[in-house]
């Protein structure tokens, strides 16, 4: 079990709210006694999120996701939740 955080990005870079969400997810994970897993979509330097308490990064890269599509993003996030057995989800 972990806390999963979806980290929003724009043009391959994390948005400020993604970093804030990761930090919040870390605090929540500490309270729950677990770790944080982040899902990133088309982010160039995804390792940066590790500085905000994320211990595992799921990097999704796809040309199909270069333009926001709610259904496709939801599918990717749902798969991550299922694969990781997430006990909580934080969305930026």
Describe the role of every protein-language-model region.
Residues 1-92:
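N-terminal glycine-rich FAD/FM-binding segment characteristic of electron-transfer flavoproteins
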């Amino acid at each position: 079990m972990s806390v999963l955080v979806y980290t929003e990005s724009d043009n391959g870079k994390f948005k400020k709210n993604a970093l804030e969400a990761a930090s919040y997810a870390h605090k929540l994970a500490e309270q729950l006694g677990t770790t944080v897993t982040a899902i990133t979509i088309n982010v160039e330097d995804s390792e940066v999120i590790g500085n905000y308490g994320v211990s595992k990064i799921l990097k999704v890269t796809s040309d199909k996701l270069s333009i926001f599509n709610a259904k496709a993003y939801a599918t990717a996030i749902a798969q991550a939740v299922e694969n990781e057995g997430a006990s909580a989800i934080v969305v930026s």
